[in-house]
């Protein structure tokens, strides 16, 4: 294997040289997806002006149809993918442009997806970011108030303690797993719970899907915001983010597992 890596027999194509994938011809998967996600919405979004950043990725094909199917006045940006410009200076990993749009005062909320659209981050009308912990907290509380929450919420060891405090104040249990959506989903299934996710905006709403779906997350949050009747900034402030820092600690492979099991490390 090492010899193959050092001296590959042929040149491997990368980036834009790989080529393109043609659209599926057997039916209309875009329309089917839009119908599915729109069908999960508990309300219409009529009158809600939304800025949407598609990261020049997967949601470019669906976001406009989805938000307008729900009645939202959606302004779609970064939805011209060419196979190379995905996530370039846009999307949930580069929120600066969306934040500037929100500060203009013309939008109620901004939604940013990543390239494959499994994550969603939100920006309120003041330009402040609403990360995955805040989104999950508001949704879990809204679900409980409407009799939709099954048990509690699942986060990870990187979930901000502010979310723990927010949920505990509302008698909503929260469990933490290792980082990764597979561990979040495993815990959700084991407990029979229906919401979990990560600070990055990767949320699993298992009543509708078994993996993260940024557009589904956005639709559920926007409906919650509309039904609650409060602006995004007020909802954002409900979940206080505690000071937090993440540090990568180097360790030999032989001892990584043992180190990860130490109570002192787990608690940090």
Each model region followed by its residue ranges:
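Gly/Ser/Thr-enriched, mixed-charge loops and adjacent short helices
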Residues: 1-104
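Predominant activation on well-ordered alpha-helical scaffold segments within soluble catalytic domains
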Residues: 2, 35-38, 61-68, 96-99, ...
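Phosphate-binding and adjacent anionic-ligand microenvironments
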Residues: 3, 109, 145-268
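Conserved active-site and cofactor/substrate-binding residues in soluble primary-metabolism enzymes
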Residues: 28-32, 58-62, 90-93, 115-117, ...
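Active-site flanking residues adjacent to catalytic metal/cofactor-binding acidic residues
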Residues: 52-55, 113-115, 197, 206
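Short acidic, glycine/serine/threonine-rich loops at helix termini
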Residues: 61-65, 87-90, 120-126, 134, ...
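Short hydrophobic/aromatic-enriched beta-strand-loop microsegments
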Residues: 71-78, 129-134, 171-179
């Amino acid at each position: 294997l090492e010899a193959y890596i050092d001296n590959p027999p042929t040149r491997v194509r990368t980036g834009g040289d790989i080529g393109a994938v043609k659209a599926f011809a057997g039916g209309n998967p875009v329309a089917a997806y839009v119908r599915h996600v729109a069908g999960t919405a508990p309300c219409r979004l009529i009158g809600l002006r939304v800025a949407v950043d598609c990261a020049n990725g997967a949601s470019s094909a669906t976001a406009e149809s989805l938000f307008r199917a729900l009645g939202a006045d959606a302004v779609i940006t970064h939805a011209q993918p060419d196979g190379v410009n995905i996530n370039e200076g846009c999307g949930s990993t580069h929120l600066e442009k969306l934040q500037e749009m929100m500060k203009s005062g013309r939008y109620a909320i901004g939604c940013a997806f990543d390239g494959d659209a499994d994550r969603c981050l939100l920006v309120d009308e003041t330009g402040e970011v609403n990360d995955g912990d805040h989104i999950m907290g508001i949704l879990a509380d809204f679900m409980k108030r409407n009799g939709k929450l099954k048990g509690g919420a699942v986060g990870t060891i990187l979930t901000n303690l502010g979310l723990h405090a927010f949920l505990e104040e509302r008698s909503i249990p929260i469990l933490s797993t290792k980082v990764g959506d597979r561990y979040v989903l495993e815990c959700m299934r084991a407990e029979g719970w229906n919401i979990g996710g990560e600070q990055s905006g990767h949320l699993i709403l298992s009543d509708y899907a078994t993996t993260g779906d940024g557009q589904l997350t956005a639709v559920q949050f926007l409906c919650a915001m509309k039904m609650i009747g409060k602006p995004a900034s007020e909802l954002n402030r409900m979940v206080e983010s505690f000071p937090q820092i993440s540090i990568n600690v180097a360790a030999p492979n032989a001892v990584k597992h043992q180190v990860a099991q130490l109570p002192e490390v787990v608690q940090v």
